[in-house]
C-alpha cells in the first residue's frame, strides 16, 4: 500500500490560503484530495459526522474531501484513515491548511513521531503563501511569518498585481530560505503540479534550487536566515558526524530545516541528509561518476551562529 502524499499549506493571515483552497476544491483536476482545514468556507457539501473523534468530514461534488480539525491533528489524520479503510471515503492526496499564526514545525513533526502516521502518510512538501503587499511589515513584526517561509519547499507570492515591483521582497525571501523556489499566484490560480511531488522531505541531490545572488542591502536583519555551506574537499564521515552532532546539541531549537549532499573521503557515492529540528536522516546516493565531487549544505534557522558553523566545517579540511 502506497503512503498518502501530504502537502502542508502555510502562510500568514491574509496571504491567500483560503483562496488557494477554494481553487483546489472547485477545480475539476482529477485528483482525489482530502483537505484538513480549521474552518469551512461557503461550499455546497453533504455534511456527515464520521468517527468517534467528532471530526467533521465533508465530501464535495468534485470528489475532494474537507475535514475540520477537532482537538488534535492526529485525531483528524487517523479519522481519515479509518474512513478510507472502511470504504466510506476515497482520497490519494492530503492538503493541510495551517492557521495564519501557526508554527509549521510541530505539524511537520507529527508525521515523523507517530508510528501509524509514518507508515500511512508521506509528507511531500510545505507550501508557504506570502502576501506581497504586507509581507515586509508582517515579517518585521512577527518572527512566525519568517518561520513559515523558512520551512517552505515552495513559496507562492500573492497580490503582486497590487504590490507591483517585488524584487527586494524576492531577495528577502531568498535570504530566509535559499532552498525554495518562488512562484507568483494570482487569485489562487496555479498549476497544482507546482504544489505536488516536491519531494521536500526525501533524500535528494537538489539541495539548493538556485544559489541566490543579492543586489540590495537588506533593510532589516531577518531573525530567520539561510546559511549555504559549500566544500570543495572530501570530509571524514566520523568528523562530519561530530560537527553535525555538536550543531544539533547547541542549536537544535534554532534549526528549522537543513539539507545536504556530502563528499565523503574514500567513498565513491554521495551521502545525502535532510532534517527538521532534531529529526534527521541520511543515506548513500548514487556514485559521483563524471561529476566533480563537492559538498553543499543549507541550514535554515533562527539567528544561527553562522561564523561558528562555517568554521566548524572549514576545520574538516585535511
UniProtKB/Swiss-Prot annotation:
Binding site for Zn(2+) 1: 37, 42, 66
SUPFAM superfamilies recorded: Hypothetical protein YjiA, C-terminal domain, P-loop containing nucleoside triphosphate hydrolases
Activity regulation comment: GTPase activity is inhibited by metal binding. Activity is decreased in the presence of Co(II) or Ni(II), and is completely inhibited in the presence of Zn(II).
UniProt cross-references to InterPro entries, sorted A to Z: CobW-likC_sf, CobW-like_C, CobW/HypB/UreG_nucleotide-bd, P-loop_NTPase, Zinc-reg_GTPase_activator
Catalytic reactions on record: GTP + H2O = GDP + phosphate + H(+)
Enzyme class, broadest EC rank: hydrolase
Domain called CobW C-terminal: residue spans: 224-315
One Gene Ontology CC term in the entry: cytosol
Amino acids binding GTP: 11-19, 161
Record Gene3D superfamilies: CobW-like, C-terminal domain, P-loop containing nucleotide triphosphate hydrolases
Motif interval(s): CXCC motif: 64-67
GO terms of molecular function: GTP binding; GTPase activity; identical protein binding; transition metal ion binding
CDD domains: CobW-like (cd03112)
Residue sites binding Zn(2+) 3 per the record: 167, 170, 187
GO BP field: DNA damage response
Positions with a binding annotation for Zn(2+) 4: 167, 170, 187
Entry function: Zinc chaperone that directly transfers zinc cofactor to target proteins, thereby activating them. Zinc is transferred from the CXCC motif in the GTPase domain to the zinc binding site in target proteins in a process requiring GTP hydrolysis.
NCBIfam families: PRK11537.1
Family: Belongs to the SIMIBI class G3E GTPase family. ZNG1 subfamily.
Subunit-structure text: Monomer in the apo form. Metal binding induces oligomerization. Forms homodimers and higher oligomers.
Protein's name in the database: Zinc chaperone YjiA
Species of provenance: Escherichia coli (strain K12)
Lineage: Bacteria, Pseudomonadati, Pseudomonadota, Gammaproteobacteria, Enterobacterales
Gene (name only): yjiA
